[in-house]
Amino acid sequence: MLILVSPAKTLDFEQPPLTQVYSQPDFLTHSQELIQVCRQLTPSDIATLMKVSDKIAGLNAARFGQWQPDFSLDNAKQAIFAFRGDVYTGFDADTLSEDEIAQTQSQLRILSGLYGLLRPLDLIMPYRLEMGTALSNPKGKNLYEFWGDTLTQAVNEALAESGSDIIVNLASNEYFKAIKPKKLQGQLISPVFKDCKNGQYKVISFFAKRARGMMARYIITNKVNTLAELRAFNLAGYYYSEEQSSPTNPTFLRAEQ
């Protein structure tokens, strides 16, 4: 199985990584193009474009200015250990074994507005550039037009290397929109996680993000290869609901927390 996840806004470049092993992102020339565009933006432009505070806009203007493509462990960090959002809390990369880190490197891919498609051990420098950002660039009016078919092709290549024909989409809609589903050369499965609230089951963003991270970790740790094994996911009180599921959207429910 090849697993797709989103990145996170929250970053940690303070804690040392779990391993000294790293790889370099595949699309750094693309990243450099975007950085050149972003460097032309003032902090005020960034605040408006990204809908962030002046403080965060200033921080990201500085990040764009400092960014350079010669990554090492002295100035960058592996993506899986740098991202610290709800998905990554659920994934809990800091407790991976060496074998699991290696497995994650071959099975997990992180969609990114700036870096395109990251392997877990790819080095990144701090940034904020969400995939849905309407950033005009030489290839179009937003990042979806900038990346075009590039990321879909990269996913197909990663899928072929994995030896599987199943893609488990645990990314948000914003990020998965950078992929062209009809051009994928495998079976696309997009799990859904619903929590009970006031007697009704619904997707609650905070819980669903954590569940997506937990499922990604579950696939790695348990060496899940089949859809039947995927449906056995039962962490944190979630259970598979055949009634609410469709062939491409296995749905997992959880009682009110």
From Swiss-Prot:
- GO terms for biological process, alphabetical: response to hydroperoxide
**One GO cellular component, as annotated:** cytosol
Out of the domains of life, which is the source?
Bacteria
The family line of this record is: Belongs to the UPF0246 family.
The UniProt entry, under PANTHER family, shows:
PEROXIDE STRESS RESISTANCE PROTEIN YAAA (PTHR30283:SF4), PEROXIDE STRESS RESPONSE PROTEIN YAAA (PTHR30283)
State the HAMAP family in the record: UPF0246
NCBIfam families associated with the record:
PRK02101.1-1, PRK02101.1-3
What is the name of this protein?
A: UPF0246 protein Sbal195_1149
| Organism field | Shewanella baltica (strain OS195)
